[in-house]
């Protein structure tokens, strides 16, 4: 495998450049090993929700929301297993294909194609788009995606194949990224259908003269911050792609909802219902990633101001003493883990999106990438899922960290190639 080559550096920047080159070389090897693992392991997996996806787990979780005392006793065995025997997931639900993971894999392979010029990586990306067209929610006219299991929430059960505005935008991004590399009419038609779904099937709820929250599914009453952020980004992008001003009008109201509900310290609660007022790492990243993309597309000044406050809160409250991502700054309940692969993946994504506007994130980016390569890569090529208080959760879960980290590192490699590195040789390919 050919190492990445960087342009000649000045003496002042030589040490940083050498470190970056070494990190890029390691990323190439890790991604190569991961694609081989993925080919062996397959594209279905268990999930962080597996304990509660089957009949027993769903009943226990529903009881927890209905009766705290009885419910706590009911879910306690699953929480114990999650903390001390994660492999017990296999007794609770079968391996499943997750659309959100397929979307991340599609984007990851598209980034590898951009970084390497290897056409087989684009073919891998298209493979996952093909799977996504199969897994759409077929009861809806327009293209949309949800979870492949019944999800018990505080507000009721979201049935399998209920469209989620926190999943569909990732699929939109995957199709958009591949469309820009391989501009087929079928990709554009799919993108147009997704935008129609997001604008029509997902509902708006006025919260002020200038803002509206949106529903999480076609059926709820809204109020979740990251849902509005996701939808605002999708429709902002679609408004430009399809020259549709109506999409921007909807997107702008959702954007204003997100901006108006930023806390004075720069954080965002999960929701505005007065109940789900926790602040965690990856949901914070979800919101800020959407804002970063909207600002990149529009130059919206208020969005940049909110991002500045958000970055300040993020760096000051969602990293531990070692400078690594921690799950919560304001937790909703007792947690059974110290660190999460998902948090690291979203941190890398966010830093890559924002380091041009907030250079201090460049240092965070390099630190977290180095940490992931040193501590989270398993011998088989996959990633650890969680750092528990005792040991690790090593169950590979495509939706819960594997696909997100693959995409993040591929994004990192692609961005490195844009910054002057020669294209790496990436010879390991998934079999067809």
What are the residue ranges of the model-derived segments?
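Glycan-recognition and catalytic cores of secretory/periplasmic carbohydrate-active enzymes
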Residues: 2-432
């Amino acid at each position: 495998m050919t190492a990445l080559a960087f342009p000649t550096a000045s003496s002042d920047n030589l040490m940083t450049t050498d470190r970056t080159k070494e990190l890029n070389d390691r990323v190439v090897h890790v991604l190569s090993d991961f694609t081989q693992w993925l080919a062996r392991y397959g594209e279905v997996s268990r999930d962080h929700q597996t304990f509660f996806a089957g009949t027993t787990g769903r009943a226990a979780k529903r009881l927890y929301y209905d009766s705290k005392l009885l419910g706590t006793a009911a879910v306690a065995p699953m929480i114990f297993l999650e903390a001390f025997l994660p492999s017990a997931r296999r007794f609770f639900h079968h391996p499943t294909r997750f659309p959100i993971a397929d979307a991340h894999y599609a984007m990851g392979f598209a980034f590898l194609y951009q970084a390497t010029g290897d056409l087989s990586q684009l073919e891998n990306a298209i493979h996952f788009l093909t799977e996504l067209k199969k897994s759409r929610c077929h009861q809806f006219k327009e293209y949309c995606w949800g979870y492949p299991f019944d999800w018990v929430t505080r507000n009721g059960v979201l049935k399998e194949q209920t469209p989620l505005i926190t999943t569909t935008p990732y699929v939109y991004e995957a199709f958009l990224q591949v469309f820009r590399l391989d501009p087929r009419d079928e990709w554009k038609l799919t993108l147009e259908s997704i935008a129609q779904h997001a604008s029509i099937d997902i509902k708006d709820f006025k919260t002020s003269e200038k803002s509206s929250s949106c529903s999480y599914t076609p059926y709820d009453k809204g109020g979740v911050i990251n849902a509005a952020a996701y939808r605002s980004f999708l429709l902002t992008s679609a408004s430009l792609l399809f020259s549709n001003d109506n999409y921007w009008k909807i997107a702008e109201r959702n954007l204003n909802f997100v901006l108006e509900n930023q806390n004075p310290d720069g954080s965002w609660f999960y929701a505005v219902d007065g109940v789900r007022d926790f602040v965690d790492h990856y949901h914070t990243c979800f919101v800020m990633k959407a804002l970063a993309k909207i600002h990149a597309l529009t130059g919206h000044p208020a969005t940049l101001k909110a991002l500045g406050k958000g970055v300040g809160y993020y760096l000051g409250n969602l990293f531990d003493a070692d400078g690594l991502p921690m799950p919560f700054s304001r937790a909703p309940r007792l947690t059974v883990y110290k660190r999460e692969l998902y948090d690291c993946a979203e941190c890398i994504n966010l830093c890559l999106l924002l380091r041009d506007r907030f250079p201090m994130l460049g240092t965070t980016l390099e630190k977290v990438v180095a940490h992931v390569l040193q501590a989270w890569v398993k011998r088989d090529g996959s990633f650890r899922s969680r750092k528990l208080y005792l040991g690790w959760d090593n169950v590979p879960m495509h939706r819960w960290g594997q696909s997100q980290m693959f995409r993040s590192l591929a994004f990192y490699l692609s961005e490195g190639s844009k910054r002057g590195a020669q294209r790496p040789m990436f010879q390991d390919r998934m079999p067809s």
